[in-house]
């Protein structure tokens, strides 16, 4: 009897996995159509397992989104994404996004300001830059969420 229950439980979980995958939040990215590093970052997060919807927009539309989200120029990157109730600004590493979604802190989102050369979508690991992923709180205050070298 125990073996039958175990096998039925395993089958139920296997059948449920596709439905669970479909409930994962979608990473919606707005980016410039001419930015190669933005496209490389989108490819990177897709390869990391995220479902991504990318849209090419002009700079006015991109900055309008950043303004609505409260992303200041000094905290901005070259592309902006949203996932669930959070924003993801710039070249944020996929493990940081996964951690954000797992821990669910009270915050607006994550940012990697600027375009650090060793960040995902840029020149790649070992390019020389160390960088921090910053958590932006509801009040706009930042704190280091993760450090990368």
Describe the function of each predicted region:
Residues 67-149:
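Thiol/selenol-based redox catalytic cores and closely related redox-interacting motifs
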Residues 25-40:
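Local sequence-structure signature of Cys/Sec-based thiol-disulfide redox active-site neighborhoods
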Residues 53-63, 83:
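Thiol-based oxidoreductase modules, predominantly thioredoxin-like and allied folds used
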Residues 5-22:
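N-terminal export signals
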Residues 26-27, 51, 85-87:
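Short active-site oxyanion
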């Amino acid at each position: 009897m125990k073996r039958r229950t175990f096998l039925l439980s395993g089958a139920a979980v296997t059948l449920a996995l596709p439905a669970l995958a479909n409930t994962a939040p979608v990473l919606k990215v707005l980016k410039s159509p001419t930015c190669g590093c933005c496209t490389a970052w989108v490819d990177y997060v897709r390869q990391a397992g995220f479902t991504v919807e990318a849209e090419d927009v002009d700079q006015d539309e991109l900055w309008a989104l950043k303004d609505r989200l409260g992303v200041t120029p000094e905290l901005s990157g070259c592309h902006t994404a949203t996932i669930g109730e959070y924003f993801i600004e710039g070249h944020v590493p996929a493990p940081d996004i996964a951690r954000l979604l797992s821990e669910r802190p009270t915050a607006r989102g994550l940012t990697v300001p600027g375009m650090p050369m060793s960040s995902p979508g840029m020149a790649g690991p070992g390019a020389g830059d160390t960088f921090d992923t910053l958590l932006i709180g509801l009040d706009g205050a930042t704190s280091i969420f993760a450090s990368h070298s």
